[in-house]
Regions:
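Membrane-interface starts of transmembrane alpha-helices
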Residues: 32, 36, 87-98, 181, ...
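Hydrophobic core segments of transmembrane alpha-helices in multi-pass, intramembrane catalytic enzymes
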Residues: 37-44, 103, 181-185, 239-244
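Membrane-interface helix/loop boundary segments of multi-pass membrane proteins
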Residues: 127-143, 191-217, 252-256
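Alpha-helical transmembrane segments and their membrane-interface junctions
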Residues: 150-173
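Juxtamembrane helix-entry segments on the extracytoplasmic side of multipass membrane proteins
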Residues: 171-183, 232-234, 238
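Functionally important transmembrane alpha-helices
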Residues: 191, 212-225, 229-286
Length: 286
């Protein structure tokens, strides 16, 4: 119990939870805040080697600290806006997605060095027909399997995001210019975010805290991180938290990332499609 409370204390202090609380309380987030979050991990990690009580959080601190550091060094929302404003939607987004792949491969390499196993970081398709746990979810019929639930969650996520973007408004334009680019950007973005917030995080938390905590930690960090993302606000947090929960659960139960990636990919197609239409509408397609 004590180590679990410590884990969640670190999540609260170093994850986007702290950043969102600061933003709501003060109206802005200082530029140094990202480095303060990294500092929390930098202090907790060596402490985990000195004190037996802190040992279970070493994996989380190492992996999440690395994620925070590389994100702070190589990316950021303001830089994303700068790329899109300077180069237009397609070249700007392509540059961002390539940058995302560099980050994802670096994080996966770091996670692999810790586990020395591709399956240990879920970097494989997985057992696509694995049963959904717990068994009571199947009620009285045959076992509910991920080959059914995976596509259903993906399609439901796509419909939810479609409702969100249409409600919040989007420019109208010839969709043929952006459709294939939206698919490409969604495929890359889904892989990048799954690598960071599922493969790396889940594989770091799972050995010491079990499936439930691994799923919840991934869900909270991914979901709250969309407070300023797309979709954003409380609706964005709820939608992405639901996606994050099912994606992390699918990754653990199928022992792979294909279904998590697919569930993420489908709503991302909608996001990038309408984002691109907005760019076209403002004559910034590139």
């Amino acid at each position: 119990m004590g180590s679990t409370l410590l884990l969640w204390g670190l999540v609260a202090a170093a994850s986007p939870v702290a950043e969102v609380i600061c933003q709501i309380a003060t109206g802005s987030v200082p530029a140094w805040f990202a480095w303060a979050r990294i500092g929390v991990m930098a202090v907790a990690l060596p402490a985990g080697y000195l004190t037996a009580a802190l040992r279970p959080v070493r994996g989380f601190c190492a992996v999440y600290g690395f994620i925070l550091a590389i994100l702070a060094l190589l990316s950021g929302y303001s830089r994303a806006r700068l790329y899109l404003a300077e180069y237009g939607f397609i070249p700007g987004m392509l540059l961002l997605q390539l940058q995302g792949l560099v980050i994802a491969f670096a994080v996966l390499a770091f996670a692999w060095l810790r586990r020395r196993s591709w399956s240990g970081i879920f970097l494989r398709a997985g057992e696509l027909a694995a049963p959904v746990r717990p068994a009571w979810l199947s009620v009285a019929g045959p076992p509910l399997r991920w080959r059914l639930l995976g596509p259903l969650v993906g399609m439901a996520g796509g419909l939810c995001v479609l409702g969100y973007v249409r409600y919040t408004g989007a420019s109208t334009a010839d969709p043929r210019q952006i459709a294939l680019w939206a698919v490409l950007f969604a495929a890359i973005n889904a892989f990048v975010e799954e690598a960071l917030f599922r493969n790396a995080l889940v594989s770091a938390v799972l050995p010491d805290f079990g499936a439930r905590q691994a799923i919840l930690v991934s869900t909270v960090i991914f979901g709250v991180g969309h407070w300023n993302g797309l979709p954003s606000g409380s609706a964005g947090v709820l939608m992405t938290s639901a996606l994050g929960y099912f994606a992390a659960k699918a990754m653990i139960e199928t022992k792979g990332m294909l279904w998590p990636w697919f569930m993420h990919f489908v709503p991302d197609v909608v996001v990038f499609y309408y984002w691109g239409l907005g760019a076209i509408g403002h004559r910034s397609i590139g």
